[in-house]
Amino acid sequence: MAFSYNYSLQASYPSQRAYVPYQQTQVPTPSPIYSLPITNTTTSGALSPSSCFLSVRQQPKEALVTVKGKEKFRKPLDPPPMLELKVSSDIDPSQQFLQNPYLFVSVSLYKHDKDEPIEGTPFDVLAGTLVSSLHRLKDVNNKDGAFFIFGDISIKVQGTYRLRFTLYELQPSYFTLSDLEQHKDLERYQGAALDPPEYGTYQCLGHVLSDKFNVVLPKDFKGLEESTYLSRAFSDQGVRLRLRKEARGMMSNKRSISGSGDLTSDQSQQQQQQQPLAKKRREDSVESANPSSLMSGFYQNVSPFVNTPYLQSQGLQGQTLQNQGLQAPVRHDTSYAWNLAYDPSFMG
C-alpha cells in the first residue's frame, strides 16, 4: 500500500516545465508628439507698419557709466524707458494685438546729433536686458494697453546719446511630420548634421527714438530720482522694476543733519519731542530699575524709626532699618520685602 501511495502522490503533482521568459517580437514605435498644423501658414491678420504707432511714454534722463569688469555694480538707466504700442481700430477692431506673443522690441544706442548707431555691437556699448516682449497692463486711466518696458539697461560709454527702439513681429512657419522626416533622412544620407529648418521670419513694424540723455562718471552722478507714478503703477501689476521712494540727494541731506554734533538747543529740543514714545518708556524703565533710586525714594518716605507690633515682638522697636542690615527691596519681589517691616498680616 505504501508503494501505491507514493505513486499516486507523484501522479497528482506532475513535473513542472522550465520557465520561458516573454519575448516581444516587435518593438513598438512611439506615437509622434509633433503637432500637425497647416504647412507654410502665417498668423492671420498680420500687422503692417502703417497700422502700428509706437511712442515713448517715459523718457530716460541720466545714466551712470558702467565700468568694464564691474557689471555687477552697474546702475540702470533712470527713469526706465517705457514704450506704448497702439494699433488702428480699423485693422484690429477687437484689439487682438494685446495678446500677440510674437511682438517684441529691441534697443540700440544712437548718437545724439545724428541718426546713426554707435560703432560696435549692442553688447559692446549696452548691458542688461536689451529686448522686451509685450506687456498687457492697465494704464493710469485704468484702460488696457500694450507696453514694452526696459527696466534694466546700462550704458558702457560716457557721453550724450539717444536710444532707438525697433518693433518686430515674428511670423512663424509650421512644418508637418513628413517635412521633419525628410530633413532627418537628408541628414542621414549626407552623414552630417544640417542646419535646422527655418521655423519663421520676422518683419519690422517701425522704430522710434528717445530724447537725449547723459551718461556721466560716478563723481558727476546725482543719484537715482524718485520713481515715477507710471513706474509704480506698472510695478503694482507685477512688472519687475527698481523703485525708490525718494531721491538720493534728499537721503544724503538727512544723514548729514542727523550726524552733525553742533545742534542748537531748539533743534535738540525738537528732536526730543519727536523721540518715539516707546524709546522714552524704555529709558524710564531703566531709571526705575536702578536700586539706588529705589532706596532713595524709600528712605525719604519712611521714617528712620519704625514702631510696629511686628517689630516690637521681634525686639526691634526704636531701631533704624539700616542698623538691622535689611536688604534693599528688589523689583520683582518688592511687596515681600516691604512686608518684612510691617505686620505679616498685611499679606492676607
Swiss-Prot record:
Induction info: Expression is up-regulated in conidia.
Motif (Nuclear localization signal): 274-280
Compositionally biased region (Polar residues): 253-266
Renumbered residue ranges of the record's region Disordered: 250-294
GO cellular component: a single term: nucleus
Subcellular location(s) per record: Nucleus
Disulfide bonds: none
Gene disruption phenotype: Reduces the amount of thehalose in conidia, tolerance to heat, oxidative and osmotic stress.
Domain Velvet as annotated: residue spans: 46-244
Keywords: Nucleus, Sporulation, Transcription, Transcription regulation
InterPro entries, sorted: Velvet, Velvet_dom, Velvet_dom_sf
Gene Ontology BP, a term: sporulation resulting in formation of a cellular spore
Function: Component of the velB-VosA heterodimeric complex that plays a dual role in activating genes associated with spore maturation and repressing certain development-associated genes. The complex binds DNA through the DNA-binding domain of vosA that recognizes an 11-nucleotide consensus sequence 5'-CTGGCCGCGGC-3' consisting of two motifs in the promoters of key developmental regulatory genes. Regulates spore viability, trehalose accumulation, and tolerance to thermal and oxidative as well as ion stresses. Positively regulates conidial pigmentation and pathogenicity on barley.
Similarity section: Belongs to the velvet family. VosA subfamily.
Subunit-structure text: Forms a heterodimeric complex with VEL2; the formation of the VEL2-VOS1 complex is light-dependent.
PANTHER family documented for this protein: SPORE DEVELOPMENT REGULATOR VOSA
Annotated protein name in UniProt: Spore development regulator vosA
